[in-house]
Amino acid sequence: METKPVITCLKTLLIIYSFVFWITGVILLAVGVWGKLTLGTYISLIAENSTNAPYVLIGTGTTIVVFGLFGCFATCRGSPWMLKLYAMFLSLVFLAELVAGISGFVFRHEIKDTFLRTYTDAMQTYNGNDERSRAVDHVQRSLSCCGVQNYTNWSTSPYFLEHGIPPSCCMNETDCNPQDLHNLTVAATKVNQKGCYDLVTSFMETNMGIIAGVAFGIAFSQLIGMLLACCLSRFITANQYEMV
């Protein structure tokens, strides 16, 4: 009977933890949907295979929501095997988040190189109509930038020979005309001077530490849930033996 107060305390803590865990799943799900709707154009320029990133967040968030509810149910039910299954799932989530966080931090320079390569390729194949061209236009308009390093990068693009610099580079598109955009000297007074690569990579460098810290913080929080679930399972089993 001595284990009952401990079980009550552990149940309360684990229910609170499972609810917070469930909330993180909802947040991941929301971020995934938001990323798909809002950041799809940026993601498509980081790497061709990275367009699945929002779907990964949506899938991960949905899974966490389901297991967060399962954790609450297992805790209220007081089932040792359910609690062990919950702890096992938390350990898998911990390992997956840890690997993802380390990989993202270690390979951040490769991500920057990939962005440089894919953005340069997108400029060379730019036609103003396809998805990657629209992505380039969206980046240049939203970040008020032009080209990779600066606006002169467009002079090597086949599109420039026929149409000049894309209007998305203009500081004021109503003040730009095709003749101005064909002439690099005149265009210098009409288009944004900053390159898109520097703006994107400086944002990554500035926020990488914060992102990594949050990722590791969330990952290690799974250890708390694992510990609570395992302890509660053990105390419930011990209490059953005491009753016998």
Curated annotation (Swiss-Prot):
Topology relative to the lipid bilayer, per the entry, is: Multi-pass membrane protein
Task: Identify the keywords attached in UniProt to this record, alphabetized.
Answer: Glycoprotein, Membrane, Transmembrane, Transmembrane helix
Look up keyword Membrane and say if it applies: yes
- Location relative to the cell: Membrane
Which GO CC terms are listed, alphabetically?
plasma membrane
User: Which CDD domains does UniProt cross-reference here?
Assistant: TM4SF2_6_like_LEL (cd03161)
Q: Which chain regions cross the lipid bilayer? A: 12-35, 52-70, 82-107, 209-229
**Ranges facing Cytoplasmic side:** 1-11, 71-81, 230-244
Main role?
May be involved in cell proliferation and cell motility.
Q: Which PANTHER family match?
A: TETRASPANIN (PTHR19282), TETRASPANIN-7 (PTHR19282:SF257)
Q: Which family would the database say this protein is a member of?
A: Belongs to the tetraspanin (TM4SF) family.
Q: What is this protein called?
A: Tetraspanin-7
Native source species: Pan troglodytes
